[in-house]
């Protein structure tokens, strides 16, 4: 009887076996993990933790994505040009979790924002140019970047509006992660510039230093990325200091936390500022100068004071140049920028070491203008500058550089006048929305909007000589677009409060 019951349990009552099955599975997994190298084991544990935390809070997955997204170029170099890097994989997983959460809660909604229509127009016009292009698959990859930016913006807005009472916390969290991403790259860049002791020979500057490039593998996009964090950090820092000044007469029990917050933002600004300088990128420097000028101008709520403040700043900077306070190596590099912006036919121009980079850039601008001339309205196809380049290349410049080194000419060549107009409309909407928030937001949240205005300006100016929708920079832009919409919610709430007070 006992033997029969034992056999029945083993054969028929399988539920009794389940705990033992899990134990055996755990033992096998443990044995496999023991055989892994320590570095691989730690990486696996970290990845598992990120996956679990993302399932609980998608915002955590997005935050980690911001940190690892700049690794894309380095991963592609090591792994040989993969389609999806770790940042892209985590982003796709985070978006999938966000959508799945909405479906499970039966609240799959598209948040209303002022950028929904501009994003839709950009997506439609760029997609329209792909059929018949030389390489639709390449154009589709560029198109997916814009789709990702739109989805990231919507996710940030949705997560921020999910619990309105925690909206400010979402804004602070996103700003912190954006600054932390900048710090992580700045530290690498500082090490590359003067602490490592070697580097690519063509990156040598000042005889013994090397241009910083982070994990971007190129100094110019690295400098552009530094601007995203630096200009945002400057705006946030001014916001915190202005809020303190307005409330200095009040007694606060949290000055310690406030000082810690200011210290953290100041550290981020200093490190990313050094990273920007060490990139030795003229385009990034001029983008920073333009972004800083806009931040100074809009810092006071009344623009006449902003104009006076900006004028004073320019005068002081001019005095610094006159007194040679600014290093001559920096001023000399900036002064040569005007040469890079001139137009002209470079066919037949003598090429030498002194003018090589300038002529190369102008040759690619000329090729872009040729594409635009032959395809006025819809261009050669979104993302198809490089595939179409051979037909328009000048004799001495057969190799495409991937883009025209002027994103506006690049876009004109790829999507024509219509596409460039839509792109301009998109950014006009971004600037307009940001300017609106500067009118109504209270400090220190106004500082975030101030930083974003600087970011948009620096980004736009830098793209006069480069293309910055590379190496997952657009992921950070998507989060910033989401921040802008959440700031608009804060501004609307503040406006209603003022109106109620007036009533």
Which sequence ranges carry the predicted segments?
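Flexible juxtamembrane loops connecting transmembrane helices in multi-pass membrane enzymes
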Residues: 208-212, 288, 322-366, 390
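Membrane helix-loop boundary segments at the extracytoplasmic
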Residues: 67, 73-75, 412-415, 447-487
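Membrane-interface micro-motifs in multi-pass membrane enzymes
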Residues: 36-40, 81-90, 141-142, 214-229, ...
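N-terminal hydrophobic segments of proteins, predominantly signal-anchor/transmembrane helices
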Residues: 52-147, 447
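Juxtamembrane membrane-water interface segments that cap and precede transmembrane helices
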Residues: 72-79, 203-215, 398-410
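Alpha-helical transmembrane segments of multi-pass inner-membrane proteins
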Residues: 1-6, 13-32, 46-53, 95-98, ...
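Membrane-interface helix caps and helix-loop-helix hairpins in membrane proteins
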Residues: 34-36, 78-81, 131-141, 274-279, ...
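Long extracytoplasmic/lumenal interhelical loops at the membrane interface
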Residues: 199, 351-366, 370-415
């Amino acid at each position: 009887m006992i033997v029969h019951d034992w056999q029945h349990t083993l054969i028929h009552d399988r539920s009794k076996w389940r705990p033992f099955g899990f134990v055996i599975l755990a033992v096998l997994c443990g044995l496999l993990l023991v055989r892994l190298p320590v570095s691989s084991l730690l990486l696996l544990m970290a990845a598992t933790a990120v996956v679990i935390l993302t399932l609980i809070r998608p915002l955590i997955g997005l935050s980690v994505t911001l940190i690892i997204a700049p690794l894309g170029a380095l991963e592609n170099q090591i792994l040989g040009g993969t389609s999806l890097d770790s940042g892209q994989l985590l982003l796709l997983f985070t978006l999938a979790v966000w959508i799945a959460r909405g479906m499970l809660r039966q609240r799959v909604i598209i948040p209303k924002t002022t950028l929904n229509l501009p994003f839709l127009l950009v997506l439609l016009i760029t997609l329209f140019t792909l059929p018949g292009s030389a390489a639709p698959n390449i154009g589709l990859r560029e198109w997916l970047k814009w789709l990702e930016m739109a989805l990231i913006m919507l996710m940030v807005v949705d997560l921020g509006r999910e619990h309105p009472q925690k909206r400010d916390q979402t804004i602070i969290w996103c700003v912190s992660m954006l600054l932390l991403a900048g710090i992580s790259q700045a530290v690498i860049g500082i090490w590359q510039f003067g602490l490592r002791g070697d580097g690519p020979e063509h990156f040598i500057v000042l005889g013994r230093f090397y241009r910083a490039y982070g994990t971007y593998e190129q100094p110019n996009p690295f400098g552009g990325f530094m601007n995203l964090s630096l200009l945002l950090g400057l705006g946030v820092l001014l916001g915190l200091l202005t809020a303190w000044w307005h409330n200095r007469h009040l007694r606060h029990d949290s000055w310690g936390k406030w000082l810690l917050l200011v210290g953290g933002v100041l550290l981020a600004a200093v490190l990313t500022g050094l990273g920007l300088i060490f990139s030795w990128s003229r385009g990034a420097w001029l983008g920073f100068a333009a972004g800083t000028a806009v931040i100074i101008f809009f810092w006071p709520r009344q623009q006449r004071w902003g104009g006076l403040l900006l004028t004073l700043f320019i005068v002081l900077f001019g005095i610094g140049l006159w007194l040679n306070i600014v290093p001559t190596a920096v001023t000399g590099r900036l002064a040569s920028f005007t040469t890079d912006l001139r137009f002209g036919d470079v066919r037949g121009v003598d090429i030498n070491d002194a003018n090589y980079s300038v002529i190369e850039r102008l040759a690619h601008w000329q090729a872009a203008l040729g594409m635009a001339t032959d395809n006025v309205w819809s261009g050669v196809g979104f993302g198809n500058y490089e595939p179409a380049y051979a037909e328009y290349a000048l004799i001495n410049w057969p190799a495409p550089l991937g883009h025209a080194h002027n994103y506006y000419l690049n876009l004109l060549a790829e999507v024509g006048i219509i596409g460039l107009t839509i792109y301009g409309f998109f950014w006009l909407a971004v600037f307009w929305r940001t300017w609106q928030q500067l009118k109504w937001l209270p400090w220190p949240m106004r500082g975030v909007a101030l930083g974003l205005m600087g970011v948009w300006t620096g980004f736009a100016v830098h793209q006069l000589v480069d293309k910055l929708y590379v190496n997952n920079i657009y992921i950070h832009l998507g989060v910033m677009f989401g921040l802008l919409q959440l700031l608009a919610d804060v501004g609307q709430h503040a406006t209603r409060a003022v109106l109620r007070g007036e009533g």
